[in-house]
């Protein structure tokens, strides 16, 4: 029994004649008749009453009722497969903030693009507020970033909370310490991100409460460049554990015991984009899973610091 025979049967019933069905399906009438005869042979029952008017037998009525859902499911499946084909050749535009863009995203995309070789992924590396604006403008599909300033049309869902450490040159006196308090950082030169960075503002509030004016500062707009300046002992930098998750020669990462700032990383979406295609949903799931793993890694590091 072929699916095209079932479709032909439904067309005959719908339009009330073999002749009309032949016109609709672009077949000859003998072909239609032969197909129905073969279908009846396959089923072992008569579907039509033989006579002047087209009428269904009891078996024909039952077959018509039960196969209606089958045809609907088949059409839905064809539609889904068509969507899938389009997804596999689509484009995903993503906004990503540092250090996620440099240190986390490459390993996620490597596996994703192996599974979706026809997908084109474009990465826009920006801070959280710029990602939020690009999402509003429609130039990106979603973003993975810190928490931006509130915009009514955009939704932010944090799925990871980072911790902060201080990074120093391995020639710096603090490099001998396993952990520090903020008071240990008095009179140091801090290398900061720009003043409009939310985490920078929080860090400076804590420093000011603890040290007053007993520290110096300089700005470096490229967050991923800080460790190069630190290595030359130009200053020290307070940054996320993720940013310094991979060892950088000539530097030392030290936990800060009394700095209770946990910068979030999360998914930023727009209310208009509530229905992502399958490939995009899969990519978001992989991103979330990777940051769940990162949370466990941080917990393990924290336990070692406490017991050490």
From Swiss-Prot:
List the GO molecular function terms: DNA-binding transcription factor activity; sequence-specific DNA binding
Cellular component per GO? cytosol
User: Which InterPro entries does the UniProt entry name for this protein?
Assistant: HTH-type_LysR_regulators, LysR_subst-bd, Tscrpt_reg_HTH_LysR, WH-like_DNA-bd_sf, WH_DNA-bd_sf
Q: Which residues bind DNA?
A: 18-37
Q: Which GO terms describe its biological process?
A: regulation of DNA-templated transcription
* Domain HTH lysR-type, chain residue ranges per copy: 1-57
Ordered alphabetically, the record's keywords are: Activator, DNA-binding, Transcription, Transcription regulation
Q: Which Pfam families match?
A: HTH_1, LysR_substrate
Q: What does this protein do?
A: Positively regulates the expression of ytmI operon in response to the availability of sulfur sources.
Family per record: Belongs to the LysR transcriptional regulatory family.
**Name of the protein described by the UniProt record:** HTH-type transcriptional regulator YtlI
Q: Which gene encodes it?
A: ytlI
